Amino acid sequence: MGTNVVRVFVILYLLAVCGCIEYDVDDNVHICTHTDVSHINHTSWYYNDKVIALATEDKTSGYISSFIKRVNISLTCLNISSLRYEDSGTYKGVSHLKDGVIVTTTMNISVKANIIDLTGRVRYLTRNYCEVKIRCEITSFALNGSTTPPHMILGTVDKWKYLPFPTDDYRYVGELKRYISGNPYPTESLALEISSTFNRFTIVKNLNDDEFSCYLFSQNYSFHKMLNARHICESEWKALNNNDNASSMPASHNNLANDLSSMMSQLQNDNDDNNDYSAPMNVDNLIMIVLITMLSIILVIIVVIAAISMYKKSKYRHIDN
């Protein structure tokens, strides 16, 4: 009995402080209406004001895909197992009773998780020089019962920045013996940035010098994420080198290649022309020779006929005399 009273007090206190109930990843949550199920005609369930399911006396339909394997929905309850960070939000059940009355049940859920967003962006780049800005942001974290404010560190062994979390946003609750955060998390202030420069031809003796780490420390736990900033520069240098190689070929080389290609194409066309038209040209010559020969024969025949005709006329003229 005493445990239940404390639990109810904790829930009410959290609702009063942050308007939500905090859960850890993989917890189970039950959102239920206290209306007698026999009085309910149907219930519509919402997640962040979007309908996710409709429950009737006969069936429930309309589950969204991310909930299918982890949710159980009925007329009176929405149960989610194995909570994920992205399950955070506002859940609402609107029950339509058989007498026309509408009953609404709402719960704001905040799922605590340790999430670090560590990114690198090139600010300045030449063929030999590269400057990268590394940014680390804590997008979510679980304090796990810590009684001291957390803090974050970004950098390498030799170069780093430190940031304590503001206690105004992360308050210590004596009854709970731990720090709590609001909903949504005021993560806009939980970020660090640091810049680093790299020379392309510098010999790297220790790979850890280029590894940037972002840590979140608390009283009894920590978690971190790592990023090799030099790899970002090397990728940009490789892309720059590829672009240089692609554009370094002189125009004359391109023109020469084009000329050679054109010459080869012309030679091929000439060969094709010769192959296509050499036979017709020989036939024409043969026809001309035949025509000349026939004309010569005809001319000879005409001359012979003329000679015979002249000979006969001469003979007849001699007889008459």
Swiss-Prot record:
Residues bearing glycans: 41, 72, 79, 108, 144, 220, 245
Entry keywords, A to Z: Glycoprotein, Host cell membrane, Host membrane, Membrane, Signal, Transmembrane, Transmembrane helix
Parts of the chain that traverse the membrane: 286-306
UniProt induction comment: Expressed in the early phase of the viral replicative cycle.
Location within or outside the cell: Host cell membrane
SUPFAM superfamilies linked: Immunoglobulin
Record bears the keyword Signal: yes
Predominant location: host cell
One Gene Ontology biological process: viral process
Domain of life where this protein originates: Viruses
Signal peptide limits: 1-20
Pfam families given in the database record: Pox_I6
Annotated GO CC locations: host cell plasma membrane; membrane
Membrane topology: Single-pass membrane protein
Record bears the keyword Ion transport: no
InterPro entries, alphabetized: Ig-like_dom_sf (IPR036179), Ig-like_fold (IPR013783), Poxvirus_F5/I6_dom (IPR007674)
Function: Plays a role in the spread of virus to neighboring cells ex vivo.
Family according to the record: Belongs to the orthopoxvirus OPG049 family.
Protein name per its UniProtKB record: Protein OPG049
Lineage of the organism: Viruses, Varidnaviria, Bamfordvirae, Nucleocytoviricota, Pokkesviricetes
Gene: OPG049
